[in-house]
Each structure stands twice: as structure tokens, then as C-alpha cells.
Amino acid sequence: MIKPKKSLGQNFLIDNNILNKIIKLTEIRNNNIVEIGPGKGNLTQKIIEHKPKNLILIEKDQTLVGNLKNDLKKYNNLEIFNEDILKFELEEKINKDSIVIGNLPYNISSQILVKLINFKIWLPKYKRLILMFQK
């Protein structure tokens, strides 16, 4: 069993009620989805069930990336990046039709939000942000 790493501010989203609420807020079918910090992939699985056009996962924890790659290898519309979202080159992967979803690590949630807001200022870079902030 994988336990959250406090050093990364991890808190895995496992509540089905919350997962379903996030999915209801998001038009996933045939859209480009970017998930920040997929963790163990609970939200990712729900996203996949709703048939996105493309799905990009950005996860810093190498152990979790290995598990995600193994668990999701049958999906060909999926890219997984083992990177820190604060250093990730959003411009190369996100387009104006993307929907960004994230259950943000509590220790860097403000920095991620600022990065996404600054990224949007110059041109429309994504369609919508659906973010959850942990306490």
C-alpha cells in the first residue's frame, strides 16, 4: 500500500463522492484534460471512464508515476510526465481547449495557482480550471 509522502504534501483523493462531484463539474468527453498530481490515479480512472480526447498527467513522485504507467499502459490517448508542475513547461502541452484538473498538494497549492493564472494572462491557454485545495 502506498502512503502519502508528507514531504511532497500528498493527500490522496479517495472519497468517491468528491471524485464524482469533480467529474460532474468537468466536460470530459472529447476534451483535452490535464491532471496535476494524479497520485494513485483515483480521479484519473474516473476521467478515463468519461472518454477524454487526450489526457496528460503531471506527477512529481517517481514511484507513483511508475504505478500509473503500469496501470494505464493500455490507453493510447494518455501521456504521463514525471515532473514538478512548478517547473513543467505548460506552453508545450496545454492548448486553449484544455481543461486543467487538480487535487493540489497543500504545501505548493498557492504557487501552482499563481503559475496557472500567470500562464492564462497572455493568451487563452486553457478552457477551464477545476482545482481542489487540501487543508
Question: In which residue ranges do the predicted regions lie?
Answer:
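Catalytic cores of RNA-modifying enzymes
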Residues: 1-135
